[in-house]
C-alpha cells in the first residue's frame, strides 16, 4: 500500500513509455482470493493490471524475497534491474528515465499507453468504511474510500437505521484544513471523540500522515500533528506539528489523558500530549516483527487497532495476526509489550481455543468491553472475543456474513461494526435467543450526500 503513491507518480510521469503490471503474491490466504484482490484494486484506485500470483510462480521465477519487489524490464524484454522495499521512487525514476532516453535514441521504444479500466459504480453512501466511534447518539464513520468522514444520528433502540447528520470533507483526496465543506482527507482511518466532549474528535488521516481535530460546533478541521510528509520512525519527543509520521492508523484516549496513536507504517505506538502539543515514542523498534519486551526493544508489525481499559492499551498487530498488550510508561524503556494471541509474521489461521492455540488473520480492530476483548478479525471476516481471565478465544459471528470488518465499537448494549468491504455499518446484538447481526440503513436526515446527489 505504501508504494502505490510512488507507482502513481511514475505512471503519470511516463504515461506513454512505462507500463506497470502488478503481481500479487499473497502472504495471507484471504489476499489470494481474486474477489478480494478486485476489491483491493477498487479500494486503492489502482489503475494498472494486477496478476493473482497465488502459487508464487512469478515470484519464484524472478527470485523475489520480500514485499514489495520491483523488477524493471526494458523494451526488448530484458530484465535490467530489481530492488525491494519502500521509498524507492527516486531510484526507480532515475533508472526509468535513463532507459527511456537510451531506447528512444536507439529507436527501440514504442510509445503507447493503455487506458485504465473504468471504475466500478458504488451507489452507497459509504465506500470501504475503515473505523467508527460512538458518543451518545452520534456515530462518526471514516468513509475511507471517499476520503471523508460521515456523522450519523443513531439510537441503539432502533439499531437498524440511522440518519445522515453531517459530512466532513469534500470527498476528494487532498490535504486541506478549513470548514467541513472545504477540508480534504486522504484515506482517513482511526477516529475518536474527545472524552466527555462529543463536539470534538481526533482523526488519523492515514494517507496524509497527519492527525486532525474536528470541531462540530464550528464545523472546522485543523491539523494538530504531522507535517504531511511520510516519515520513517519517531525515536525522540518532538513538537507535534514537526513530527514526520508514517501512516497513523488508529487513535485512543487513555487514562493518563494522552492520545495514543498506532503508526502502522513505522510499526510503532506513539503518544500525543494535547497540553504540550508534543509527540513522543512509546513502543516499537521500527523493525517489523513480533518481539515482546520493553517498549524500545519490542518489535511490532503494522499496529492498526487500539483500545484502552484505562490502565493498559491493547492493540491489533495486523501483520503478525496478533493481539498484544502495552503497559505504557513515561519512556519507551519504561513501557512493556506482551503478546496475548499470535505467533509471528507468517503464523495465521482461523481457529478458536486457548490463547496459545488460537489463530487470527490480519485483525484491524479491537474493543475493550466489560473485561473481554472483542476483535475485528478482518481477513477471517469474523468478530471474536478474547477473554483474558480464561485465556480463551471464541468466534461471535460466522465467517460468511461480514466482509473484512475493520472496527467494532459499543454503545450501551448494541455494537456497531465497520464492515469495510461491504461498504456498510453493521450492528450486533446479544439477545436471549442468540446473536443478531444486521445492516444499518442510513437515511438522508438533515444532509444530502453530494457524491450521490440524485439519490434519495
Mark where each language-model region is.
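Short, internal strand/loop/helix patches
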Residues: 37-67, 71-73
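Thiol-/selenol-based redox modules, centered on thioredoxin-like
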Residues: 74-131
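Gly/Pro-rich loop segments of beta-rich domains
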Residues: 109-130, 156-189, 220-249, 278-302, ...
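Structural microenvironment flanking redox-active thiols in thiol-disulfide oxidoreductases
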Residues: 2-43, 54-58
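Conserved beta-strand positions in repeat-built beta-propeller and related beta-rich domains
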Residues: 141-147, 195, 201-207, 261-265, ...
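Residue-level detector of Asp-centered blade-edge/turn motifs that repeat once per structural unit
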Residues: 134-136, 193-198, 253-256, 308-311, ...
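Beta-strand-rich domains and repeat architectures in extracellular enzymes and scaffolds
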Residues: 120-150
Amino acid at each position: 500500500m505504501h508504494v502505490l503513491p510512488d507507482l502513481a507518480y511514475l505512471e503519470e510521469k511516463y504515461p506513454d513509455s512505462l507500463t506497470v503490471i502488478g503481481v500479487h503474491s499473497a502472504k495471507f490466504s484471504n489476499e489470494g482470493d481474486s474477489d478480494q484482490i478486485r476489491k483491493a484494486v477498487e479500494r486503492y484506485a489502482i489503475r494498472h493490471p494486477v496478476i493473482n500470483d497465488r502459487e508464487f510462480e512469478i515470484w519464484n521465477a524472478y527470485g523475489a524475497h520480500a514485499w514489495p519487489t520491483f523488477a524493471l524490464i526494458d523494451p526488448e524484454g530484458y530484465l535490467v534491474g530489481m530492488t525491494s522495499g519502500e521509498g524507492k521512487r527516486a531510484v526507480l525514476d532515475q533508472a526509468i528515465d535513463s532507459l527511456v532516453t537510451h531506447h528512444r535514441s536507439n529507436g527501440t521504444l514504442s510509445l503507447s499507453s493503455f487506458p485504465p479500466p473504468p471504475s466500478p459504480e458504488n451507489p452507497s453512501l459509504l465506500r470501504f468504511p475503515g473505523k467508527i466511534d460512538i458518543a451518545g447518539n452520534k456515530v462518526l464513520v471514516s468513509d475511507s474510500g471517499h476520503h471523508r468522514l460521515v456523522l450519523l444520528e443513531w439510537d441503539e433502540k432502533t439499531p437498524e437505521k440511522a440518519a445522515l447528520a453531517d459530512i466532513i470533507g469534500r470527498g476528494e483526496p487532498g490535504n486541506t484544513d478549513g470548514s467541513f465543506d472545504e477540508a480534504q482527507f486522504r484515506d482517513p482511518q482511526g477516529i475518536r471523540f474527545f472524552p466527555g466532549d462529543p463536539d470534538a474528535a481526533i482523526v488519523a488521516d492515514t494517507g496524509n500522515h497527519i492527525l486532525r481535530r474536528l470541531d462540530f460546533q464550528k464545523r472546522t478541521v485543523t491539523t494538530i500533528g504531522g507535517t504531511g510528509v511520510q516519515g520513517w520512525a519517531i525515536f525522540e519527543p518532538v513538537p507535534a506539528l514537526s513530527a514526520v509520521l508514517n501512516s497513523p492508523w488508529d487513535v485512543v484516549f487513555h487514562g493518563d489523558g494522552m492520545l495514543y496513536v498506532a503508526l502502522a507504517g513505522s510499526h510503532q505506538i506513539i503518544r500525543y500530549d494535547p497540553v504540550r502539543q508534543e509527540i513522543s515514542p512509546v513502543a516499537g523498534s521500527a523493525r517489523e516483527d513480533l518481539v515482546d519486551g520493553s517498549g524500545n526493544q519490542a518489535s511490532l508489525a503494522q499496529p492498526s487497532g487500539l483500545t484502552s481499559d484505562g490502565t493498559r492499551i491493547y492493540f491489533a498487530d495486523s501483520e503478525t495476526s496478533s493481539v498484544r498488550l502495552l503497559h505504557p510508561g513515561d519512556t519507551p524503556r519504561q513501557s512493556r509489550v506482551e503478546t496475548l494471541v499470535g505467533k509471528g509474521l507468517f503464523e495465521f489461521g482461523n481457529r478458536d481455543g486457548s490463547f496459545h492455540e488460537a489463530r487470527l488473520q490480519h485483525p484491524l480492530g479491537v474493543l475493550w468491553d466489560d473485561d473481554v476483548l472483542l476483535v475485528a478479525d478482518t481477513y477471517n471476516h469474523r468478530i471474536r472475543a478474547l477473554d483474558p481471565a480464561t485465556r480463551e478465544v471464541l468466534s461471535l459471528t460466522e465467517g460468511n456474513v461480514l466482509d473484512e470488518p475493520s472496527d467494532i465499537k459499543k454503545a450501551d448494549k448494541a455494537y456497531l461494526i465497520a464492515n469495510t468491504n461491504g461498504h456498510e455499518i453493521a450492528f450486533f446484538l446479544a439477545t436471549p435467543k442468540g446473536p443478531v447481526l444486521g445492516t444499518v440503513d442510513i437515511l438522508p436526515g438533515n444532509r444530502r450526500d453530494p457524491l450521490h446527489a440524485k439519490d434519495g
